Regions:
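C-terminal structural segment of proteins
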Residues: 1-247
Length: 247
């Protein structure tokens, strides 16, 4: 049993916004893999909850008219890992979220929840920073988009204003085309553990594959929010692809 004051079930994004405005202290819940655990521990006891789990309009992955990859905020980790668009263009994200918890968590946990909780150790967080992701937010005043590095404000806090809801994460075509990368997770255990630190790197090579044309390096748990490593990126850009440069 969970100690909650009330549970409201949103029927649409607009209805979720209306519920948020009517109940400003309520907690949004989707998969519930974080919120319900916190409630069980008494940290959110007596809270009102707004469930958005039934909103299929913000679930799924597609390429938009500009060939940007659009990931609905209710898309689960398992769906992301298996999705052919992810596998073809940004498989590093699929690999990263496949390291979250166990199969049960990945089957119900969502990319939106993983980013909206503002936790720097989230496996998706550093990976999305390395993809120059854009966060789409829908609220009373319409839709706004901002770079993911601006979405994270401080530890446990993201840029969601009263009545707003994260509805998608977008990877622009120019952010993924020609890039390849890897995500490395360090943790106390090999599985079922949060990251002690996480590092995601995406590299774009020259046509002859001998020079680093561009690189993005992002870390989780290196600070209160996920962060890029601009000095390391600048040092590597334009350099030959050698062990000396990589190390």
């Amino acid at each position: 049993m969970y100690d909650m004051k009330a549970l409201y079930e949103a029927t649409s994004v607009q209805n979720a916004i209306e519920l948020r405005l009517a109940h400003p202290e309520a907690q949004i819940i989707a998969g519930g893999t974080d919120v319900l655990v916190q409630m069980r521990e008494g940290k959110r006891a007596g809270k009102e909850l707004i469930s958005i789990q039934g909103l299929d309009e913000i679930r799924g992955i597609c390429l938009d008219e500009n060939e940007a990859i659009r990931i609905g905020s209710l898309t689960t980790f398992s769906h992301i890992t298996r999705n052919p668009i992810i596998q073809k263009y940004i498989n590093v994200l699929g690999e990263a979220v496949d390291m979250v918890g166990g199969p049960q968590i990945r089957n119900i946990g969502t990319i939106g929840g993983n980013t909206c909780n503002g936790v720097t150790s989230a496996d998706s967080a550093s990976t999305l920073h390395a993809w120059d992701a854009i966060v789409e937010i829908t609220g009373p005043e319409g839709v706004r988009r901002l770079p993911i590095h601006d979405f994270y404000i401080k530890a446990g806090k993201v840029d969601l204003r009263p009545g707003e809801l994260q509805t998608a994460i977008i990877i622009p075509k120019e952010a993924y085309e020609g890039y390849h990368g890897h995500y490395i997770k360090y943790a106390m255990r090999n599985a079922m553990d949060i990251a002690t630190t996480g590092c995601s790197v995406n590299v774009k090579l020259s046509e002859d594959k001998k020079t680093i044309k561009d690189v993005r390096i992002a870390y989780g748990v290196a600070g209160p929010v996920p962060m890029r490593a601009p000095s390391a990126e600048a040092k590597a850009k334009g350099k030959p692809l050698t062990k000396a440069v990589v190390h």
